[in-house]
Structures are given as structure tokens and as C-alpha cells.
């Protein structure tokens, strides 16, 4: 019996420990990958096969943590809580929180956050720590980004960190619309797949709305509001 109790206790401890992490990971594209303060040597480097030495790295990365994609998304959410008379007590509390979030986000829609910069700086530190011979003095680094502001700034955070680590690198850094054809390429097959598999989410926002609004019929796009609120709250971890 003691053994069973111990196993149950251990299981509960593990579950509670994972709960906070899993909630963050549920943010999907807004999940903020952790950044460590070390030089990157905490994770083991991939070893080259016997008789070979690393001489080249090709890195294709997404932009770092960002704000929600457009200011209009913040404004739209805030507008849904404009009618105080239709808000429940919880709805009034949420309105106050949403207002503070939107004020803080004003003018930042789609932009890279400070955490996003740190994530790409950390990638550069790990690369340099694991493969210093590739980034020796006089070696060349060629970097390209899409025309998106957050992507260009992610690239600059990465290359600037490399420059700090090895000032004698030859950096070729550019953002050019001419490169978009291969940076953001979508094959005809992928486009067809997206069209074929696009389905409307079968999720009811009824319970969600009833917690916030007295008359839910006044909300024109209930599913959109629920998903946008999910995106709003998930994105908060990107601005810590």
C-alpha cells in the first residue's frame, strides 16, 4: 500500500510540474522558447563522423517571439468589451485586463519582442560555442531574411551576436524582396493540400461567452472572439 501511495504521489508531483509548462506550450506559435544565460554549452553538439571535421553550417530559422501580428487585432478585441452594460462581473474584470494589454501593445503589432531578439542571440552563442572553427577570424557568414520587419530584426540579432563573439568575421547581411521566392516558397502541392484540408473549427464558444457577457447574442463573431482571446493571452509569454 505504501508503494502504491508513493507512486501516486510521484505521479501527482510530475503532473503538477508539467502543468505550468504545458499551459505555456499550448500557446502554439506563441510558445516562447526558453533562453538560457550560458554560452550554449549546456546542450551537446552533434559530433562529426570519425575522420571528418565540421566546416559549414546552414541554418533556416523562424523569427523570434513577437507581438500579435497586427495592431488591429488588439483593437478588435478591446472593442468587443465596449458595452459595460452587457458585461458580467468577470467580463468587467477581463475588460480592465484587456485594456492594459492593448495599451501596452499599441504600435507593436507584428514586431519582434526583446525576448525574440534574445532567442536568436542565444542561437548564435550556441553555434559559436559548439563550432568555433567555423566562425574563425576571416571566415564568411552569409545571412538573408524575408522582408518582414520581425524577420529582419531576428537576423540582425543573430548576426550582431556573432560579430560580438568574433569581430573579424566577414558578414554579408541583406533583406531583399528578390529573395522571397525561395525564402517563403510554397509548392503547388502544398497550396492544394491547404485548400483541401481547410476546415472550420468545431468548437462551441457558448460557455466562454456566458462567463463574460449577459446577452451573448450581441456578439457578432463569437468563435473569432474566443480564438483571438486565446491568442492574446498566449502571446503574453512572449513579452516577459
Segments predicted by a language model, with ranges:
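N-terminal helix-rich structural modules
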Residues: 143-145
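Bacterial Sec-dependent N-terminal signal peptides
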Residues: 1-22
Amino acid at each position: 500500500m505504501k508503494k502504491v501511495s508513493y507512486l501516486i504521489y510521484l505521479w501527482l508531483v510530475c503532473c503538477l510540474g508539467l502543468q505550468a509548462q504545458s499551459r505555456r506550450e499550448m500557446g502554439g506559435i506563441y510558445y516562447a522558447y526558453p533562453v538560457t544565460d550560458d554560452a550554449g554549452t549546456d546542450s551537446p553538439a552533434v559530433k562529426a563522423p570519425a575522420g571528418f571535421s565540421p566546416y559549414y553550417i546552414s541554418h533556416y530559422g523562424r523569427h523570434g517571439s513577437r507581438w500579435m501580428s497586427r495592431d488591429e487585432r488588439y483593437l478588435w478585441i478591446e472593442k468587443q468589451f465596449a458595452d459595460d452594460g452587457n458585461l458580467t462581473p468577470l467580463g468587467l474584470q477581463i475588460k480592465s485586463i484587456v485594456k492594459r494589454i492593448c495599451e501596452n501593445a499599441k504600435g507593436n503589432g507584428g514586431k519582434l519582442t526583446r525576448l525574440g531578439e534574445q532567442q536568436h542571440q542565444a542561437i548564435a552563442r550556441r553555434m559559436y560555442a559548439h563550432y568555433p572553427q567555423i566562425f574563425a577570424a576571416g571566415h564568411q557568414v552569409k545571412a538573408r531574411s524575408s522582408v518582414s520587419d520581425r524577420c529582419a530584426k531576428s537576423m540582425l540579432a543573430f548576426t550582431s551576436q556573432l560579430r560580438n563573439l568574433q569581430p573579424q568575421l566577414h558578414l554579408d547581411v541583406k533583406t531583399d524582396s528578390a529573395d522571397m521566392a525561395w525564402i517563403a516558397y510554397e509548392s503547388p502541392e502544398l497550396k492544394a493540400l491547404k485548400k483541401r484540408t481547410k476546415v472550420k473549427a468545431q468548437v462551441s464558444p457558448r460557455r466562454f461567452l456566458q462567463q463574460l457577457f449577459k446577452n451573448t447574442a450581441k456578439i457578432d463573431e463569437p468563435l473569432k472572439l474566443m480564438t483571438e482571446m486565446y491568442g492574446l493571452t498566449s502571446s503574453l509569454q512572449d513579452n516577459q
